[in-house]
Design a protein with these regions (language model features):
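A surface-exposed beta-strand-loop module
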Residues: 25-27, 92-158, 218-219, 528-533
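Beta-strand-rich binding/interaction modules
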Residues: 96-101, 467-468, 483, 487-542
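Beta-strand-rich interaction surfaces with strong enrichment in secreted/lumenal proteins
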Residues: 58-61, 75, 110-112, 124-129, ...
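Extended, low-hydrophobicity, Ser/Thr/Pro/Gly-biased non-transmembrane segments
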Residues: 35-37, 138-243, 544-547
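Surface-exposed beta-strand/loop patches in extracellular or lumenal glycoproteins
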Residues: 74-93, 180-184, 189-199, 453, ...
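N-terminal, polar/Ser/Thr-rich
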Residues: 20-70, 97, 157-164, 468-469
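Hydrophobic alpha-helical and helix-loop surface patches within well-folded domains
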Residues: 17-20, 31, 225, 257-501
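Solvent-exposed beta-hairpin/edge-strand motifs
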Residues: 83-109, 201, 510-519
């Protein structure tokens, strides 16, 4: 935004701390202020780091009448270091019935376990597990889930017609709200199997490829699914309801949709948008990441979550997001279809290694919305669309939060993350190079867990530019940079410099008149530009760069 007044300095939304060039605003409480449960849950301590996840086989039964859950998770892992203990996670509302170590030569052996702070479960072995060896344990549990987090985690509900409905949504609270696992983001299984026993009058849908179902003698049906790609824990899903199914295809990719019967016709119309989305994102990033598992949308009562290959959808089969906006660019497409599907590339295929770097999911997915707009309606509409997000950015805390503890980054990770990427595009000032970078960035990191340092190193290397100060200013500091302008009408000059918390910040920016921009290269030191443009007509391309501007005469 630009604020100006002759003979005065006006700054709108610019903290005094920024102009004083003082230390960054702290993001969240310091690491020592977090609880032991937060440190165990968010850290990658020795009993997580000593093993590498290989495979899960999750087998559960859901009782929709008693609202209970029981079953086991078989966990296969390789020891990276010798040890006698590993760390797993399960919320305390569940009872741990037993944990068994499989043996190739005899009966399974019961293992000792200890529940520590929060949801931590230490599993102890009678002998030292050898480095490089592969082991499998069966973790049996039972209990009644308790709703947690924004969308509930594991939720028993009734659909609008009063029929039983069960959905999962646990990105915020973690998968251990409903099943035992190594609940962190750094280490992912290479694949998994999901088997769910549900009442036979209902349909169960999980991520992965449908394998089979078996009618059981007690009124339950067992649904079997197989995930054939790496998957993070929170993306493992379970949905049980009175669903009807309809299918389609996009080339060789299967498209499967599960909705309430009364919503079938609306869904058939609204979900036609999926093909445009798939084409756009495949064009920008590469093919859909999980072709062998297919693409699914599953109706839910909350707005939607990016469960891998089984995205939950609750946007009322309308464009926009839950009825907003009523007009404008955002009203031209279904936000949930576009945003949550973007997570298949950014969040599910590429996953942040630590929650502190969650902008790698949300900032990139939010930016992908503007790319969809650009594909459908052109670049100018995309720029307009992405700039509508500015009103939602608070700039109170850095986008990247405290690493190594359980801490959710601020909501700015969404819009500010996207605005940063739009700014980066403008800095590079070469759309052909930008789109090539986006495609190659995704291809380079797909099916991996990464940190911001990896993103930065990639862009530094492949642009040949030193982008470290730019990344640091937008992601590791709270405030955005201010372009300070000082006008001398008599001499027809404009002084300019950056006021930014990152000392080496030196981003180029376009100024002057919109139909004839001039590129300047401000630093922290004053420079001078000859310009006959009066102060009240002198523009800055704030739609291309996420900055504040101050004008002074």
């Amino acid at each position: 935004m630009i604020a100006w007044q002759a003979a005065a300095l006006i700054l709108v939304g610019v903290p005094e701390v920024l102009l004083a060039q003082s230390a960054p605003v702290p993001a969240h409480p310091a690491a020592q202020d977090f609880s032991e449960a937060d440190r165990l849950r968010g850290g990658y301590g020795p009993y997580r780091a000593n093993n590498d996840l290989l495979y899960y086989q999750l087998d559960v039964r859901v009782d929709t009448v008693r609202q209970t859950l029981s079953g086991k998770n078989s966990i296969r892992f390789k020891m990276l270091k010798p040890g006698r203990r590993i760390q797993l996670d399960l919320v305390r509302v569940f009872q741990i019935d037993k944990i068994l170590l499989r043996s190739a030569t005899g009966a399974p052996r019961a293992l000792h376990f200890e529940r520590a702070a929060g949801r931590t479960v230490y599993v102890d072995f009678p002998e030292t597990l050898r480095q490089g060896r592969i082991y499998t344990i069966d973790f049996y549990y039972s209990g009644r889930p308790v709703e947690m987090g924004r969308f509930g985690g594991f939720v028993f509900r009734k659909d609008p017609m009063g029929r039983p409905l069960v959905n999962t949504a646990c990105e915020e609270e973690g998968a251990s709200v409903w099943w035992p696992n190594k609940d962190q983001w750094r280490d992912e299984v290479e694949g998994m199997e999901i088997s769910v026993e549900a009442p036979s009058d209902l349909i169960e849908v999980s991520g992965g490829r449908f394998q089979s179902k078996q009618e059981l003698p007690d009124g339950y049906t067992r649904w079997n699914w197989k995930v054939q790609y790496p998957i993070n824990n929170y993306d493992v899903s379970l949905n049980i309801g009175k669903y009807v199914h309809f299918g389609d295809s996009y080339g060789d990719l299967s498209l499967d949709y599960f909705v309430f019967p009364e919503d079938l016709e609306k869904a058939q119309r609204q979900f036609a948008q999926v093909k445009d989305m798939l084409y756009a994102f495949s064009r920008f990033f590469g093919e859909y990441p999980f072709p062998n598992d297919g693409y699914k949308l599953v109706e839910a009562l909350y707005s939607g979550v990016e469960n891998q290959t089984a995205i939950t959808y609750g946007n009322h089969f309308e464009n926009g997001y839950l009825g907003r906006p009523a007009s404008g660019i955002g009203a031209r497409f279904d936000f949930i279809i576009v945003h949550e599907s973007a997570h298949e590339w950014f969040g599910n295929s590429i996953t942040a290694r630590d929650r502190s770097d969650m902008w790698i999911h949300e900032g990139w997915a939010n930016y992908s919305e503007s790319l969809f707009v650009e594909y459908m309606w052109g670049k100018q509409d995309a720029i307009t669309y992405i700039n509508t997000g500015k009103e939602n950015v608070k700039n109170q805390f850095p986008v990247i939060s405290t690493e190594g503890v359980f801490s959710t980054p601020p909501a700015d990770q969404y819009k500010k993350g996207a605005l940063f990427l739009n700014t980066l595009r403008s800095v590079l000032d070469d759309d052909a190079e930008w789109f090539s970078l986006l495609h190659d960035y995704y291809q380079h990191f797909k099916y991996q867990t990464i940190m911001t340092s990896d993103v930065l190193a990639y862009f530094n290397k492949h642009t040949g530019k030193e982008l470290t100060p730019l990344f640091a200013q937008y992601l590791r500091h709270a405030a955005i940079p201010v372009l300070q302008l000082k006008f001398n009408a008599a001499e027809h000059t404009v002084g300019y410099r950056w006021a930014a918390e990152e000392a080496a910040f030196d981003m180029p920016v376009r100024v002057g008149r919109r139909d004839d921009w001039q590129l300047i290269h401000p630093t922290a030191e004053w420079k001078t530009l000859e310009s006959p443009i009066p102060m009240d007509e002198f523009e800055v391309a704030t739609d291309l760069y996420y900055i504040d501007v101050s004008k002074q005469s």
